[in-house]
């Protein structure tokens, strides 16, 4: 850059930039002299904010050059058009956050903060940003811009929504900075009367600055009595001489000179900035009650709900009973100690089966006849109907003593609904066990070996002998799902807030890198996952009777929970980079977590899936982690078991693969987590 250009703090040379089919800059030139206020005027949508972002380096020109005297971000103070501040921080915390990012000492932050309070008439410093008015918010935003005493100050519509009297005081303060501290200020405004206070102004229209100079010189040049009249004259002349500028296939041949770069990402991770980000994100989390509830308390509540509602035996199911032997209300007094083969016995063994079912918490209701019982079942009033004939006990003697003479009319009869397979299977199993128990009780009371009524088969359970319910074998998959889901909700919520509210973009102007933000988020996510996962595991395996075998594999069980949280965290970042709102981001999380839960055996074993679908399900991270965790908990497999090693390695490989996808996508889609406002 030649020396004469350095009489300017900012110099834009032959800038071209297009959006879609319309050019925003069409050979724009701009000169901002040192120690002056430059007022940039123009209608809404003409590209003023885009020009400022190009100067800051967050956007690039298609061609042309921007030369700056400033070479460090710290030398520039930028106030975006939108607020771009964390709403859950107080004004005091916001100043401390940005002061730390600019590597200011605490003492210097306090001194500068007191100056800005007096200058900008800021509200109570303990007020949350989200609770103050729009005008107050813009004053805080301006204060953040001035906090680190920058040499070049760039303000995008700083006085919008501010009281006219205070607006004048702010202008007086800016003029004083220029005179006493030799600051250079670029300010965009819609208020033409404000522009009269600037040392130099530029009117931007149709992609160029149609005029640039001191306000008095422009008024004199066009023989106008005010700046507004002069600009109206300029606009009329431009409309008469130019057609609207549209992008054509012709390529601009202007050489693209090297522009000054302020937004170069830092090569080293700054732990001071990470500490500031940790503090900010911690405040944002614990003051966002709904997010804190979702990512910490809700997993604990869901684990409790799971243990109370999934996989247990169904209770209080209604069964209609017709017992021609005895009223079922009298069965509670039945004593089975007498043998039915004794003379003059009055035993009614149907009571054994009825009492057995009652002990399983079935609701038994007596009906008068078979037709009524069957109709109640067919009309979905009851789930089953059981009939014991009048001579059931006497015929049972025949069944045991002379089996070949036992008639079909002596059988107990059952009619049940088939609309719910789980209900049907449980009732059928329990009634079968009740009749088996009835026969065994009869044999025992008559001093016979009750094993006569058992199957001639020895059953040896190798693994899972304590597994009694479906929930026992799906608890691990549920914990893996919770670890994935709630970590992903945290990362997608925080990152989309940073992205959509412009918070990350503004922090990057203060030197923050995306890597530093991700490190701070990752630390908080791990703290959350360790906290709620520990409590959830205690609930699932200590407070509720889900079986677990204590072995060295428990360490790997915990590691798998943490790895699943990493996968969820990374997937949330991916969704945040691809989606524009929290609504879409959260729905992606819901859909993917539910799909994995369905396909990984959390609802039904994958053995019931088609061969092709099962081959896909076996590769899902939730399946890999959940199956390995089940093997550790229910089979007692240890760290050195091949299946544990393979399952853990494959789950970790998913996290690495997702990380590589994020890195690659960030190279292809630049600024996918950043929106500059």
Please tell me what each predicted stretch does.
Residues 56:
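Helix-to-loop junction immediately C-terminal to a conserved catalytic motif
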Residues 96, 100, 108-124:
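Conserved ABC ATPase "signature" region
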Residues 212-213:
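ABC ATPase "signature
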Residues 189, 259-472, 642-644, 664, ...:
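Extracytoplasmic/periplasmic domains immediately adjacent to an N-terminal transmembrane anchor
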Residues 221, 301-310, 325, 467, ...:
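Membrane-spanning alpha-helical segments of multipass transporters and channels
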């Amino acid at each position: 850059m030649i020396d004469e250009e350095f009489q300017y703090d900012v110099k834009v040379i032959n800038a071209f930039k297009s959006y879609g089919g319309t050019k925003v800059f069409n050979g724009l030139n701009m000169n901002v002299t040192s120690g002056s206020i430059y007022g940039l005027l123009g209608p809404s949508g003409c590209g003023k904010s885009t020009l400022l972002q190009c100067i800051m380096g967050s956007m690039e020109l298609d061609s042309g050059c921007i030369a700056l005297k400033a070479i460090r971000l710290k030398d520039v103070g930028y106030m975006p058009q939108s607020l771009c501040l964390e709403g859950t921080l107080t004004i005091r915390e916001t100043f401390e956050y940005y002061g730390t990012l600019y590597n200011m000492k605490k003492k210097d932050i306090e001194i500068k903060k007191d100056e800005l309070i007096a200058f900008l008439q800021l509200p109570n410093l303990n007020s949350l940003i989200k609770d103050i008015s729009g005008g107050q918010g813009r004053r805080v935003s301006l204060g953040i811009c001035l906090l680190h005493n920058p040499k070049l100050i760039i303000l995008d519509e700083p006085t919008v929504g501010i009281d006219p009297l205070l607006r004048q005081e702010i202008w007086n303060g800016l003029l004083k900075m220029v005179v006493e501290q030799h600051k250079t200020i670029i300010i965009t405004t819609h208020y033409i009367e404000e522009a009269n206070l600037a040392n130099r102004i530029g009117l931007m229209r149709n992609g160029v600055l149609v005029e640039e100079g001191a306000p008095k010189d422009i008024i004199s040049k066009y023989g106008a009595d005010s700046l507004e009249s002069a600009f109206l004259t300029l606009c009329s002349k431009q409309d008469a001489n130019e057609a609207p500028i549209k992008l054509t296939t012709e390529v601009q041949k202007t050489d693209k000179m090297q522009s000054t770069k302020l937004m170069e990402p830092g090569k080293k991770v700054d732990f001071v900035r990470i500490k500031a980000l940790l503090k900010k994100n911690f405040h944002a989390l614990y003051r966002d009650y709904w997010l804190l509830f979702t990512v910490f308390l809700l997993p604990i509540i869901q684990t409790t709900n799971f243990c109370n509602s999934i996989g247990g035996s169904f209770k209080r199911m209604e069964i209609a009973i017709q017992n021609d032997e005895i009223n079922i209300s009298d069965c509670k007094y039945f004593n089975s100690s007498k043998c039915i083969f004794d003379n003059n016995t009055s035993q009614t063994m149907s009571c054994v089966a009825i009492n057995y079912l009652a002990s399983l918490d079935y609701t038994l209701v007596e009906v008068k006849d078979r037709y009524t019982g069957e109709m109640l079942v067919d009309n979905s009033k009851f789930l089953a109907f059981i009939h014991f004939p009048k001579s059931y006990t006497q015929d049972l003697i025949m069944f045991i003593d002379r089996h070949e003479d036992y008639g079909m009319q002596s059988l107990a009869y059952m009619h049940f609904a088939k609309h719910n397979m789980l209900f049907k299977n449980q009732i059928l199993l329990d009634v079968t066990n009740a009749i088996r128990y009835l026969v065994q009780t009869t044999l025992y009371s008559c001093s016979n070996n009750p094993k006569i009524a058992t199957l001639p088969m020895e059953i040896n359970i190798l693994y899972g002998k304590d597994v009694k319910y479906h929930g026992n074998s799906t608890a691990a998959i549920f914990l893996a799902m919770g670890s994935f889901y709630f970590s992903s909700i945290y990362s997608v919520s925080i990152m989309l807030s940073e992205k959509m509210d412009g918070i990350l973009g503004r922090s990057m102007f203060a030197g923050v890198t995306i890597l530093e933000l991700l490190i701070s988020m990752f630390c908080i996510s791990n703290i959350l996952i360790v906290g709620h996962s520990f409590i959830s595991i205690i609930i699932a395996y200590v407070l509720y009777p889900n079986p677990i075998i204590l072995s060295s594999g428990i360490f790997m069980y915990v590691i798998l929970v943490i790895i699943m949280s990493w996968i969820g965290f990374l997937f949330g970042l991916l969704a945040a980079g691809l989606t524009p709102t929290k609504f879409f981001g959260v729905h992606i999380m819901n859909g993917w977590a539910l799909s994995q839960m369905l396909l990984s055996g959390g609802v039904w074993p994958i053995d019931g899936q088609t061969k092709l679908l099962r081959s896909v399900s076996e590769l899902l991270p939730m399946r890999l982690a959940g199956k390995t965790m089940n093997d550790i908990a229910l089979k007692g497999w240890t760290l050195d078991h091949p299946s544990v090693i393979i399952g853990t390695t494959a789950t970790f490989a998913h996290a690495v693969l997702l990380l590589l996808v994020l890195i690659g996508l960030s190279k292809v889609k630049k600024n996918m987590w950043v929106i500059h406002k």
